Amino acid sequence: MTQEERRRWLICYLQREMPEYAHYGIPNDEAGQWHLLRALFNVRPPAPVTQKFQRIEGELLKTITAAKGIVNGMALPASGLDSRLALWQDDITRLRIDAIVNAANSQMLGCFLPNHNCIDNIEQTMAGVEMRYDCYKLMQAQGHDEPTGKAKITSGYHLPARFVLHTVGPIVQGSLTDEHRRLLASCYESCLTLAAEHGLKGVAFCCISTGVFRFPKDEAAHIAVRTVRHWLDAHPDASIERVVFDVFEDADLLRYERLLYT
C-alpha cells in the first residue's frame, strides 16, 4: 500500500467504528488526510483494534517517522557538566532510545483534543491507538486516577523508542509552593526508578508541567537537572547510562544549555 492508501484505509476503518464522524469527507491532499486521520486517532475511545489495523497503522506511522529522521539518543553528545546527560532540541518522537517520557494527565488516556500539539497528543498519535488502550487497562486495574509524581510504563508501539514512561506533573494554580517542587522532582525520580526496574539504559525526558500546567520554566529546568543528577549519583549500579533532556523551544534550549554546559 502507498501512504495515501494507508491513510484512506485507516480513515474509513475509524469512520465505520465511529459513525458520528462519518460525514467528514476524505480530503484529496496529503495534509488534509493526515489532519483528519490524526483527529480520529485523538478522539477514539480506548478499545482494541484488529491485527490488520495495527499493521497498516504501524506502516504509516513508521514511514512518517523515518521521513523525519530517526536519531540515536544514546549517541547524542554528552553534556560538558555530566557525561551521563545530553541535550537535544527537536521532536521527541524521533528518538531511538529505550524510553521517552510523556507528560500525561491523571486519567492517563492521552489528549482527546483533535490535532492538539501538546506532548501527550503528539506521543500518543505517533505511537498509535494501541497505547491509549494499554493505558486504559493499566488504569482499570489500578482503580483510580494516577497520582501526581508517579509513573507508568507502556510499550512504545510504533515509536522508535521501545517504551514510554507516563508521568503526571503538578498543576500550578497561583503561587509556586514547595509541594509543587517536590512533586515535580518526584516525576523525574519515578520515571528513572521505573526505567531501572526494567533494565533500561537510556531515557529521554520532555519538559514536564511547563505547558498548560504552568510550572515556571526556569525553576522546572533546575529541578529536572538537579533531580536527575542526584538520582544517578544515588544509584550508581542502576542500568541507566544516558539521560536526554529534550526541548522544543529555543528559550528552553538556552535554559538547559546554561545548566548543562556552563
PLM regions and their residue ranges:
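Macrodomain-like recognition of ADP-ribose-binding/processing modules
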Residues: 1-262
